[in-house]
């Protein structure tokens, strides 16, 4: 009789496990599909990726150099189940229009202007803003114009303090603006080539033991849009304009101090270009910001996608942005 009872219990347990397995098979995670879109603004096409329900709170992902919205291809599906996610390509980057730099002067004011117009075209008023690298000068210009539209900030290796730049790095940006010689131009132009993009950007913060965490898809995609002299000159002009951001840091810092936006800082602490002091400096003006120094480099969203997604979801849930 005891054996029958034991067999019966084991049978129920086995059946229960099989049922759970079957349920899991039928309930695996399916994120909303990402769509690939163009909006025409002032006769210019801006490309953007979108995913999620438009009724949900909006997250806008602003990319850096030398990339595009492609840098968020893995992050988007991790956020879009709960949020409506928009990731535009800057004017002159990725699939957006590449206007001739001989007739269009590329500045961060220009990029911010077009990105703001894109959000207006999409009827997006309030949003969480995620910024990385070049995304910071674009995003902070937008925030200066309309600080009340920002529900929260997510800062990922996005500098707004001189603390995050070595003196050598500061001098690089200053001379990029002031030195108009051909020698300087040739140097800046060389930074947009294949070797610099791969080895001085994506692999710069890595070592031989962890090279395999960085997908070659990233730089392969970027280099397609840095294939011509025109494309590379666009980025040279942005290098030449970058010092305007350093000069704007005090204004941005005052804005942050006055508005106290809910802020999550997820910073790759191995970043040699925008070092971790730049992350810590935010706490001077935003003492309530949440700071996480990640075991990653400048492209932390490529290296630590899942960890960043988890931090974002927990942070937004904690602040009732859902």
Name the predicted role of every residue range.
Residues 6-10:
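Sec-dependent N-terminal signal peptides
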Residues 15-16:
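C-terminal motif of bacterial Sec signal peptides marking the signal peptidase cleavage site
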Residues 68-69, 137, 297:
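A short, glycine- and basic residue-enriched loop/turn
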Residues 22-38, 42-46, 51-54, 86, ...:
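Flexible "cap/lid" subdomain of the alpha/beta-hydrolase fold that forms the substrate-access gate
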Residues 70-73, 77, 113, 140, ...:
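Surface-exposed alpha-helical interface segments used for non-catalytic interactions
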Residues 50-98:
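Conserved HGGG/HGGXW glycine-rich cap/lid loop of the alpha/beta-hydrolase fold
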Residues 1-4:
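Positively charged n-region of N-terminal signal peptides that target proteins for export
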Residues 297-309:
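Catalytic histidine-centered segment of alpha/beta-hydrolase-like enzymes
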